[in-house]
Amino acid sequence: MSENYTPRLKTRYREEIREKLNGEFSYENVMQIPGVTKVVVNMGVGDAARDSKLINGAIEDLTKITGQKPQIRTAKKAIANFKLREGMPIGARVTLRGDRMWEFLDRLLTVALPRIRDFRGLNDKQFDGHGNYTFGLSEQSMFYEIDVDKIDRPRGMNITVVTTATNDDEGRALLRELGFPFKQKGSAE
């Protein structure tokens, strides 16, 4: 990325969304206006305990999707019933901050989520009480960086959007303004 390039979602947040949120919640200080701190993309690969090559596919997919090399997550303790030993790789995680985070959110909202078959919106009850939002995707094929013909197996992932909001209402308002497609209250499940 060049020096003077700013992601369009970041520009929209700075120029429009902050003013709307300030008008809606009337903050005393501009630093109280909620913003997005980081986005964590986690891909659990429980089968990697039996076949260690499976983690490589998850790492490859996450690298393509996020543009950043994932951190391999290992088992913290052994569980005999799952044939799991301490230190075995069981997942991969990427933490996105700054411009990469804004680019990922933009691609997620404008390209990936609309490509999901029978997508009716995200559940708006999955906030943690502090304005952070977590949702899961069942497979990786909706990202255009992934070649559908080369997918060895469908892999789901959890995406957590960490915000500076103090409660769920502020977080929900921020994400709705950013363009997160939440389900409408009146629609049937």
Swiss-Prot record:
Keywords: Ribonucleoprotein, Ribosomal protein, RNA-binding, rRNA-binding, tRNA-binding. One of its GO terms (biological process) is translation. Belongs to the universal ribosomal protein uL5 family. Signal peptide: none annotated. This is Large ribosomal subunit protein uL5. This is one of the proteins that bind and probably mediate the attachment of the 5S RNA into the large ribosomal subunit, where it forms part of the central protuberance. In the 70S ribosome it contacts protein S13 of the 30S subunit (bridge B1b), connecting the 2 subunits; this bridge is implicated in subunit movement. Contacts the P site tRNA; the 5S rRNA and some of its associated proteins might help stabilize positioning of ribosome-bound tRNAs. One of its GO terms (cellular component) is ribosome. Part of the 50S ribosomal subunit; part of the 5S rRNA/L5/L18/L25 subcomplex. Contacts the 5S rRNA and the P site tRNA. Forms a bridge to the 30S subunit in the 70S ribosome. GO terms for molecular function: rRNA binding; structural constituent of ribosome; tRNA binding.
